Amino acid sequence: MLKGLTQLLRPNGYFTPMAWVLAALLFINRLSAMVKLFMALYLRQELGLAIETVGWLLSAYGAGLLVGSMLGGWLSDHVRTARLTAALFFVSVWVLMLLGLVTQVPWLAALLLLSGVIDGAIRTLHQRLIMEYCEVAQRSRAQALSRVARNLGMAAAGVAGGVLAQADFRWVFFASAAMTMLALLWFVRTTWRRPVLVVGDESADGSSVPPRDKPFLWLLAATAVLGIAFDTVYSTLGNYLRDYYHLSTEAIGWQFGLNALLVIALQIPLSHAVERWGSRWQMLVGSVLLACGLGMLPFGSGLAFVCLSTLIWTLGEALFMPPLNVLAMHFAQSGKSGQYFGLFFMSWSASALLSPVLSGQLYGQFGGHSVWLMSALLVLISIPLTWQATRGA
């Protein structure tokens, strides 16, 4: 098994060189995600803001993701993707620096909104880069490798962010800005002058207009509901573990790191093991595990129970995420890739807008346990939507 996995990870074997280049870019960029992981704690613990205010501020970031996802898709149909990506990385460096310096709520809201726009656009553009620089047969493999790279970066970000936050929360912002600058330099060095592959219009069902593509619309609905449930991990889990499980900031950081490390270790072998299930059953089983992992949090105590919860919902994440993104790429091959990717990531980004508000209000009014019961219910609601989206998949 280990020998087979080693063969898969050879630079010029199963994955193309460009898949490795884009995965490395995503890894470096994800190191700056420590800001997202610890933003809720920073706003509440360092700045002393109410939990409801924290929810509204994080929703500003979510609103930016929503706008940026669609804007990035639209712009990528008119501006060279590499040039647009580099410009967004450059602006992001300064936004992250400013987030660590300002303390007024209106300025924080504006900067979080702008940061969300940038992150949403970059997320969409990364998918476009895979389509532009990878052959059709290699795109799903590039997706898998990018997912491992993303979580490897998140693991490092969670651990490093926890250590930096213990010393001074502002170091989290400055380190994130430095990592974003490094991502920009890597991107310019490896991709700027690389020729784009000629991508032809490919359509699996003859439909090239997203609003008329019914399976794609079901996918958008399932994506939005799943996203709202899953985003509570980023918007609420840190404060919940501090308030109800009494974990330290560093222990919370290690919890995020555990999630990412599990994905790194299990994603590729797990994806191969369930490959014959098809997209539908991978997503359905993953959703059930996600609901169980999040829904069990109110019924236990102690670090070991939290780790068990993390293990279960991480397995669910590892099962439903890859087919979700591969399905989006399949629909995007209809020739309107910018529109499809924009709408898909806009749907996912809606969770970052709605989830902090919903979870913040539930947390403040009914206590932290209600957040995870709501999340589990939403995941279960997504199951029939997923069933409709994956007819024939």
Give the residues covered by each predicted segment.
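Helix-loop boundary and gating motifs at the non-cytosolic
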Residues: F15-G62, W218, A222, G227-Y245, ...
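Helix-loop junctions at membrane interfaces in 12-TM secondary transporters
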Residues: G100-L111, P298-S309
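Helix-to-loop junctions at the C-terminal end of transmembrane segments
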Residues: G68-R80, L266-S279, Y363
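Juxtamembrane intracellular "pre-TM" segments in multi-pass secondary transporters
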Residues: M1-T16, W192-A221
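Cytoplasmic helix-loop-helix junction between adjacent transmembrane helices
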Residues: L113-R150
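Symmetry-related core transmembrane helices of the 12-TM Major Facilitator Superfamily/SLC fold
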Residues: V172-V188, W372-W387
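Interfacial helix-cap and linker-helix signal at transmembrane-aqueous boundaries
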Residues: L43-R44, L75-S76, V163-Q166, L241-R242, ...
